[in-house]
A protein has these predicted regions:
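Sec-dependent N-terminal signal peptides
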Residues: 2-11
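Acidic, small-residue rich beta-repeat scaffolds with periodic aromatic anchors
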Residues: 13-29, 35, 113-118, 125-250
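Beta-strand-rich domains and repeat architectures in extracellular enzymes and scaffolds
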Residues: 26-49
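Beta-propeller blade termini
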Residues: 30-36, 82-94, 170-174
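Entry beta-strands of beta-propeller and related beta-repeat scaffolds
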Residues: 40-43, 95-100, 176-184
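Short N-terminal edge-element motif at the start of the domain
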Residues: 43-100, 104-108
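Hydrophobic beta-strand positions in blades of beta-propellers and related beta-sheet-rich domains
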Residues: 55-61, 120-122, 223-225
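Contiguous hydrophobic, core-forming segments of folded domains
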Residues: 93-126, 131
């Protein structure tokens, strides 16, 4: 093939991008809900196996409609840990190789507060090979921790009776390679001002109105680039991700 023609074909091939998997109504109440690409070329669902102890990610070539999955992958998580759902896919142009993003949502409620978070796990599906888990990153977190237990506490806190933690991240694909390069950008902030779950907020000096602002956490507001390492069969970041459990562990 002439070099110019090959270059033109490569330029015409779309760069891989995350496609959101849209839920498709289940046939019966209580059934696992599949989620599909807009063209219904690929569908996935997450359900417990026959023992009801192991979660399985099922991948379908088209809508399930009673057909057998192309392949299945056991998700390493107890059913009770969180709620899993198919989130997105990356497709390789001209190939049946795809990467599925499975999203796990965690929720916790406690006296006077609560929180939720989500993580995305990427699983690579290559025809003729066993599926491989290649990356897990936190995507979101939102927590409220009770900080007032009486009228005096309300005065000390200037009416801000909860410590709040907010975390949001975005994962994007870049370039023409497959698996593609991924960029990960996160933003984290607390309110009122800089607070920490490892400290007693009531042990600090009384708050003033000027203290009732959000404070960006620079340590957990980061940008990372992940490249796929064939030897490790996994994505590797250009620098380690920080421990942001204050935001991502409800």
């Amino acid at each position: 093939m002439p070099a110019l023609l090959l270059a033109a074909l490569l330029a015409a091939a779309p760069s891989p991008q995350f496609e959101t998997l849209e839920p498709v109504p289940a046939a019966a109440q209580g059934e696992a809900i599949p989620a599909c690409t807009a063209d219904r070329r690929w569908c996935a669902l997450i359900e417990a196996d026959e023992s009801d102890e192991q979660l399985m990610l099922r991948l379908y070539d088209g809508a399930p409609d009673g057909r057998a999955p192309v392949t299945s992958y056991p998700i390493e998580s107890e059913v009770s840990e969180g709620f899993w759902k198919p989130g997105a896919v990356l497709r390789r142009a001209g190939s049946d190789e795809i990467i599925v993003g499975a999203d796990m949502e965690l929720q916790s409620m406690y006296s006077g507060g609560g929180g939720m978070s989500s993580h995305r796990t990427l699983i690579r599906f290559v025809p003729g090979a066993a599926p491989q888990e290649i990356l897990t990153v936190p995507l979101s977190g939102s927590l409220m921790i009770r900080a007032c237990f009486g009228e005096e506490d309300m005065k000390q806190r200037a009416g801000a009776c909860h410590d709040e933690y907010e975390f949001a991240a975005e994962l994007k694909a870049e370039g023409d390679a497959f698996p593609p390069r991924l960029t990960y950008a996160s933003t984290a902030a607390t309110f009122p001002g800089r607070v920490s779950r490892s400290e007693d907020s009531l042990a600090k000096p009384p708050l003033k109105p000027k203290d009732l602002v959000k404070a960006v956490d620079a340590e957990c507001s980061v940008r990372r680039v992940f490249t796929f390492d064939p030897a490790a069969n996994a994505y590797v970041p250009d620098a380690p991700l920080p421990d942001c459990g204050d935001y991502t562990v409800p």
